[in-house]
Amino acid sequence: MKCKPNQTRTYDPEGFKKRAACLCFRSEREDEVLLVSSSRYPDRWIVPGGGMEPEEEPGGAAVREVYEEAGVKGKLGRLLGVFEQNQDPKHRTYVYVLTVTELLEDWEDSVSIGRKREWFKVEDAIKVLQCHKPVHAEYLEKLKLGGSPTNGNSMAPSSPDSDP
């Protein structure tokens, strides 16, 4: 665990920072996704998400993060997968699908850091994310391939006899 000004960072036993994020969709058709401006690079777009707090479940963390970063409430859906980023720092992000039911006019990050949000067609979102945050583009690419909990990335190692 490490302390940051307004949060405590948590790590799993393998040293990965525990994160959670949501692909926030305008409707259950999942054809328009909400992206937020990056806090470091305000002219670039990212998927809302962040670090999990101690004792927090991934789904709860994902809902909290999109409320803080994107100012949305919604219906939490399926776990799309667990995505690993092995660069320093290492992250392991639980990515959920959320259908937006409420857009707040003002929200925490819009007031404190001027964060913006914008709806994108999925194909356009993939293009803008590939430049700045390729791992975020992977979330949407997986969704297009029919990602669901049964075929999501798994953190469990495969058994030796399952290799071809």
Swiss-Prot record:
Its main location: cytoplasm. It is found in: Cytoplasm. It holds the Pfam family NUDIX. Its cofactor is Mg(2+); Mn(2+). Binds 3 Mg(2+) or Mn(2+) ions per subunit. Mn(2+) may be the true cofactor in vivo. Belongs to the Nudix hydrolase family. DIPP subfamily. This is Diphosphoinositol polyphosphate phosphohydrolase 3-alpha. It comes from Homo sapiens (Human).
